[in-house]
Amino acid sequence: MRTEYCGQLRLSHVGQQVTLCGWVNRRRDLGSLIFIDMRDREGIVQVFFDPDRADALKLASELRNEFCIQVTGTVRARDEKNINRDMATGEIEVLASSLTIINRADVLPLDSNHVNTEEARLKYRYLDLRRPEMAQRLKTRAKITSLVRRFMDDHGFLDIETPMLTKATPEGARDYLVPSRVHKGKFYALPQSPQLFKQLLMMSGFDRYYQIVKCFRDEDLRADRQPEFTQIDVETSFMTAPQVREVMEALVRHLWLEVKGVDLGDFPVMTFAEAERRYGSDKPDLRNPMELTDVADLLKSVEFAVFAGPANDPKGRVAALRVPGGASLTRKQIDEYGNFVKIYGAKGLAYIKVNERAKGLEGINSPVAKFLNAEIIEAILDRTAAQDGDMIFFGADNKKIVADAMGALRLKVGKDLGLTDESKWAPLWVIDFPMFEDDGEGGLTAMHHPFTSPKDMTAAELKAAPENAVASAYDMVINGYEVGGGSVRIHNGDMQQTVFGILGINEEEQREKFGFLLDALKYGTPPHAGLAFGLDRLTMLLTGTDNIRDVIAFPKTTAAACLMTEAPSFANPTALAELSIQVVKKAENN
């Protein structure tokens, strides 16, 4: 039906007869001439109808936005004064000789001249996706997956599919369950990841595996989370953690070079402990120059319990954040930041405003200065490298609250004051995570997943001191986003059972949920390691949007609903009966 795409016409096509198919993006009626901007997935081209083709001109008078049409015409160069430098096709136009209206469009529920609500965009997603910026994002996503496949193929990885209907295993979130009609009362689970299957593929001898795969997690949603999402899933045998990172870093550098024309360079490597200490986050945004500075040792003897308490507590921390130029902040802004850190558990926000260091105590403004002597204040200013015009904020509490609150404050202030260089790319690897973390109920939970290997520990050493274990795990972070994470896996049955035991999974439950894995570990399992990237998040970064729904064709809302299809919906009672399922309705509160 077409000979060319609208958006691909150039001066090289001048004089050629072309047939185009697409939609009316805009129509301008000048009486004797009608101009339309005609759009397809590749872009927009100007088409005009003149009186010499009376039939086409008459039909063109009926055109409205989003009519689906076919046009045949001749490509012509525009006059110099009519060239549109803002359009890729702006040097040419098409003189139409014939027009076919394939399908007309009703009054549109979306307004192309105004910003539409996200609810409307999701309800009429098929119209929203016609917008050039949305089409470009999905084209970029397709380019990314194509680049990934070629790269992985060139590096000897095999694309192997793993099951969608599988067994429920604890991986940190709730499973989406699928009832079995054949096996009454039993359920499959949709995979949260192909984790165990890709490990089993390594045990099967496939050495290098990858898959671009859908994953499902029934968890509370955030702006950058979806109940179904796509991973670039990777697993290798006989490769160390640094070797895995090297190949995966090469992949990401390749993507940025091909999609953005940017060489990311070598990625720095930082331990989890260093990231938390310097940035209050295990996914630091290195475009932001501010760092946290520990000052607890300077405050142990002060008569100010807010500082002295955490300073003398082994589980406490007092950290300072120097804000260059922050002395210009108003009292209202400071109060707003004080309320902001309370979201993360902090009780408030102490500060020192540095007006003129040379004047000593008279050169600063601080509600806590009266609790600190001149020597301590000077030591704090020295350690934070404070200069005239700076602001120093303080966080004092247990280590987690200080890291969470001050890390979030660092990001917010960096953005608010323009300190974060948003023109840069700042990738890094974060390694050496704690293997376990407190579950809040006196037990331990895996920080990543229960199949991650400890670093340089035997099973006996791990069992004796699990709280000291460092995981052989690594995350890739770009501009403050965790885009991928992985680890060396446990390849020894005793170690795997030890980890299960630490996590409170008894032997009976181990056999019930992971018997197939424990059996496989008995038969010559190779050392193996892997990683998974979030394709949606990678695409979000590479297309410059901050909304993950912009890079998914048909996403869900934050309530895990599809406004277009109205899923989820009630099931047919007959279908439920065949599955031996009865829906129990909870009584509504009056």
UniProtKB/Swiss-Prot annotation:
- Catalyzed reactions: tRNA(Asp) + L-aspartate + ATP = L-aspartyl-tRNA(Asp) + AMP + diphosphate
The molecular function terms of the Gene Ontology recorded here are: aspartate-tRNA ligase activity; ATP binding; nucleic acid binding
Record GO biological process: aspartyl-tRNA aminoacylation
UniProt key word Nucleus = no
Q: Among its keywords, does the record have Aminoacyl-tRNA synthetase?
A: yes
Recorded GO cellular component terms are: cytoplasm
**What subcellular compartments does it reside in?**
Cytoplasm
Quick one: which residues bind L-aspartate? E171, R217, H448, R489
| Residues that hold ATP according to the record | R217, D218, E219, Q226, E482, G534, L535, D536, R537
Which purpose does this protein serve, as stated in its record?
Answer: Catalyzes the attachment of L-aspartate to tRNA(Asp) in a two-step reaction: L-aspartate is first activated by ATP to form Asp-AMP and then transferred to the acceptor end of tRNA(Asp).
Entry similarity comment: Belongs to the class-II aminoacyl-tRNA synthetase family. Type 1 subfamily.
Its subunit composition reads: Homodimer.
The protein here is known as Aspartate--tRNA ligase
What's the source species for this entry?
A: Escherichia coli O7:K1 (strain IAI39 / ExPEC)
Name of the gene this protein is made from:
aspS
